[in-house]
Amino acid sequence: TLTAGIAQDGRRLDYFLRTANVPGNLDNVALAGLYGHVAGNRGQVNLCQKNRAGREGFRFGLDVAWNDSLVRAGVTPPDPVFGYEPWTVNPGNYLVYRYGKSIDADLDMRHGDQRFAIRTVPGAGASDDIRLDIAGLNIGSALGLLPSAPPVDGVLGTDMTLGMTPDSLTLRGDLSIAELSYDKRRFGNVDFGLYYKQDQGHMADARLTLDGAEVLTVRGDYRAERESPLDLTATIPGFPLQQANVFLPD
């Protein structure tokens, strides 16, 4: 069942959208809703979800404000729920995007050893960078919110830094999944490293390791002014196909 509504109170516009499923149909998303309001140059959006047993899968919101030069958002409430688990979020958190291609942030969400943080950090040049720091994130719990989630599990960690100026973009860092498994069958410890830069052209350098052994490296450079714009090299030292079998049906 899908219900929706809009109501006006002076300059404020309230809205909601709710879906409810009958027993036996998507029981992990028995009830889901989106609601909030808009007033002038400010607004709020809230999302919630419960399973058939009444457990909250997620409950969080965003306070948003905007003007002719930027958009600012903050996560609410101070005790949001993600992946059926209670988290905490730092007071006064914010994400700001300036239309001149600039981002500022101070967001730190935690649950036990799990962390999701986005922060402004000093950059190599005149502009600041944005750092994404994820540690100990349980993939299985997060995917469990999806109606037809694949049976994937593991622990996600990320340390990525994004640098932006009006003329260039740089992305560098690492992503790891410890004890990645599919349908409770182990695949391995996966690590992915990336460096990417865009200015007058594009340059990328990536590597992939599995259980500490390098299985793929890619290096590329694209310059439109060259006779052969793309220079790309990929190396596969050796990929253990037996481990890849965990993703294939029996």
Task: Please report, for each region that a protein language model flagged, where it lies by residue.
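Interface amphipathic segments
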Residues: 1-161, 165-250
